Regions:
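A short, N-terminal "cap"/entry segment at the start of jelly-roll beta-barrel domains
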Residues: 1-32, 121-156
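A short beta-loop-beta micro-motif enriched in histidine and acidic residues
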Residues: 25-33, 44-58, 72-74
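Ligand-binding loop in jelly-roll beta-barrel domains
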Residues: 88-117
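Short acidic-glycine-tyrosine-enriched beta hairpin
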Residues: 72-89
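Conserved short histidine dyad/triad with adjacent acidic residue
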Residues: 19-21, 36-52, 87, 91
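Short, conserved beta-strand element in jelly-roll/cupin
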Residues: 37-41, 52-68, 109-113
Length: 156
């Protein structure tokens, strides 16, 4: 059990991407859905622009001050109370940034747990993230290899 007014936050990020995240569904014992409460300080982005291959995501703006960069690439205000869905694939690309003067909060709800399996594409930096319970790895997409590279056929 957890409470949105007193969740266990983890501090994440680097300059420009500082954020606090509480994985409230996980803290409450959920195993197949992800719900996180995010707190984004002024001038910081919650995360890089990205889209998911497996998980669909919904964001609920709890405060004013957030701006959304969607799949079209343009920034727009995300007013308090707005609920927006991000489908899987490039059309679900998104990034949230706090352009306000005070900390802004939002909820994210995903079709998979926050520590679940997903593949995430980061087009701005050319990375691909592979995530599961045991794997949290990011790779540059430019280093893709041929399907058969390194494979040896069985010998009799």
């Amino acid at each position: 059990m957890t409470n949105l007014n007193e969740p266990d936050f983890e501090d994440r990020g680097v300059d420009g991407f500082r954020v606090r995240r509480a994985r409230v569904a996980q803290q409450a014992g959920a195993r197949k859905i992800g719900v996180s409460l995010w707190e984004v300080p002024p001038g910081e982005a919650a995360y890089p622009y990205h889209w998911h291959v497996i998980d669909e995501e919904v964001v609920v703006a709890l405060d004013d001050g957030l701006s959304l960069r969607g799949a079209a690439g343009e920034w727009r205000p995300l007013p308090e109370g707005e609920v927006i869905a991000f489908p899987v694939g490039a059309e679900g690309g998104h990034q949230l940034w706090n352009r306000g003067e005070s900390t802004a909060r939002f909820l994210s709800i995903s079709s998979g747990p926050s520590e679940g399996e997903d593949i995430v594409i980061y087009p701005d930096s050319g990375k691909i993230g592979v995530y599961s319970e045991d794997v949290y790895e990011l790779y540059p997409r430019e280093r893709a290899v041929d399907y058969w590279e390194g494979e040896t056929p069985p010998s009799p």
